[in-house]
């Protein structure tokens, strides 16, 4: 069905099509029982045997423990304001990452700021953290009392906040959403907020992560919860800087890594939109992000979970990242090109790959490639 609708959507400006689709998903999310019923058709095992094959538990035996019915999640950026979480979980995602959210609402960069590269199965965006702020997100998350999957919140700083004060913006996000977020993702790697990537420098990153963790601990008295804190890194770091940043994340006590954000690289692209400024996502990142996952797994020695994201268009792509060391994987750009049915396709494909390799649970392939 999506392949019939896609040509119509692709006639629209990319951001207009995004808003139209998201509005439809928001309306579907509000239909009682519909998202949960749809989920029984999209998550392997909800209707029959072998339902444990894709199930993962991370941060076990701690206040941060979470269970995922599938290792496949929605990457941040598609549902910036948590408008359609029930619909996305109905697709079959094992978790949903919303945001990036900043303490105050902001409009982001000027349009046009989102571009398709169909021949390359890629997107370029320079959105600039456009979002409705933490208060609006809190109101939306507060009504999701019966969540089918964990909801992670990707947090950032407002554009007007200088880097020396950035930690307070991240703390404000945690303070505002700590009672509702199942995890926080510290975004210091978007290329579309001036100076943001400088916060990936090891010393600055360690200080920022500690500030976020301090806020999480301070909130435990009020919320009785301790959501894990993950850090999302860029794919464009020099290898030595990447190693230093990963080490800083570990030393500061973060709970995991997301590898990786969009890239500024333009190698091998054919579409004219390759000249647009912004972060590139999609198929061109498939191999690069998988290699970075492998590097991160080697550097961390499997001490913390890794989420692999970048160019996941098939079960084989997801499986490659798991073999490289990812515990979970995320998709975004592939949804634009393949549609929501891709989620079920990847889930079912992962089950078949496990059966082919004689593996009972997805956890047993992590880091084995």
Swiss-Prot record:
Q: Which residues bind substrate?
A: 80, 125-129, 187, 192, 261-262
Top-level EC class, please? oxidoreductase
What SUPFAM superfamilies does UniProt report for this protein, alphabetically?
A: FMN-linked oxidoreductases
Q: Which UniProt keywords apply?
A: Cell membrane, Flavoprotein, FMN, Membrane, Oxidoreductase, Pyrimidine biosynthesis
What is the annotated signal peptide range for this record?
Answer: none
What note does UniProt attach to the cofactor annotation? Binds 1 FMN per subunit.
GO BP, sorted A to Z: 'de novo' pyrimidine nucleobase biosynthetic process; 'de novo' UMP biosynthetic process; pyrimidine ribonucleotide biosynthetic process
Q: Where in the cell is it found?
A: Cell membrane
Record has Membrane as a keyword:
yes
Reactions performed catalytically = (S)-dihydroorotate + a quinone = orotate + a quinol
| Stored CDD domains | DHOD_2_like
Example of a GO cellular component annotation carried by this entry: plasma membrane
- Entry GO MF terms: dihydroorotate dehydrogenase (quinone) activity; dihydroorotate dehydrogenase activity
Question: Which Enzyme Commission number(s) are on file for it?
Answer: 1.3.5.2
**Which residues does the entry assign to the active site, renumbered to this chain?**
190 (nucleophile)
Binding annotation for FMN: 76-80, 100, 154, 187, 232, 260, 282, 311, 332-333
List required co-factors: FMN
Q: Which family does it belong to?
A: Belongs to the dihydroorotate dehydrogenase family. Type 2 subfamily.
Purpose: Catalyzes the conversion of dihydroorotate to orotate with quinone as electron acceptor.
Put simply, this protein is called Dihydroorotate dehydrogenase (quinone)
- What gene codes for this chain? pyrD
């Amino acid at each position: 069905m999506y392949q019939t609708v896609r040509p119509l959507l692709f006639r629209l400006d990319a951001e207009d099509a995004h808003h139209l689709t998201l509005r439809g998903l928001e309306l579907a999310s509000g239909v009682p029982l519909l998202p949960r019923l749809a989920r029984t058709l999209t998550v392997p095992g909800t209707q029959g045997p072998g339902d444990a094959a894709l199930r993962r538990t991370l941060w076990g035996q701690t206040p941060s423990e979470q269970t995922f019915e599938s290792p496949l999640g929605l990457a941040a950026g598609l549902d910036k304001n948590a408008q359609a979480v029930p619909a996305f979980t109905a697709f079959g995602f094992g978790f949903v990452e919303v945001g990036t959210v900043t303490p105050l609402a902001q409009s982001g960069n000027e349009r046009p700021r989102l571009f398709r590269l169909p021949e390359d199965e890629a997107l370029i965006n320079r959105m600039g953290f456009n979002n409705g702020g933490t208060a609006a997100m809190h109101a939306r998350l507060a009504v999701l009392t019966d969540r089918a999957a964990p909801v992670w919140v990707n947090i950032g700083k407002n554009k007007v906040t200088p880097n020396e004060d950035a930690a307070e913006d991240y703390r404000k996000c945690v303070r505002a959403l700590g009672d509702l977020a199942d995890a926080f993702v510290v975004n210091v790697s978007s290329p579309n907020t001036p100076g943001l990537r400088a916060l990936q420098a090891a010393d600055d990153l360690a200080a920022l992560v500690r500030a976020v963790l301090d806020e999480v601990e301070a909130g435990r008295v009020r919320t009785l919860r301790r959501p894990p804190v993950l850090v999302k890194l860029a794919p464009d770091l020099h290898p030595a800087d990447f190693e230093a940043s990963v080490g800083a994340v570990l030393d500061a006590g973060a709970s995991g890594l997301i590898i990786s954000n969009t890239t500024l690289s333009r190698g091998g692209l054919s579409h004219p939109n390759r000249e647009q400024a912004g972060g590139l996502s999609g198929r061109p990142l498939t191999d690069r992000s998988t290699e970075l996952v492998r590097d991160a797994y080697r550097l961390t020695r499997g001490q913390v979970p890794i989420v692999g994201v970048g160019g996941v268009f098939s079960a084989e792509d997801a499986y490659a990242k798991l073999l490289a060391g990812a515990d979970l994987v995320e998709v975004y750009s592939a949804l634009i090109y393949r549609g929501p049915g891709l989620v079920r396709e990847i889930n079912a494909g992962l089950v078949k790959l496990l059966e082919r390799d004689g593996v009972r649970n997805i956890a047993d392939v992590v880091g084995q490639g």
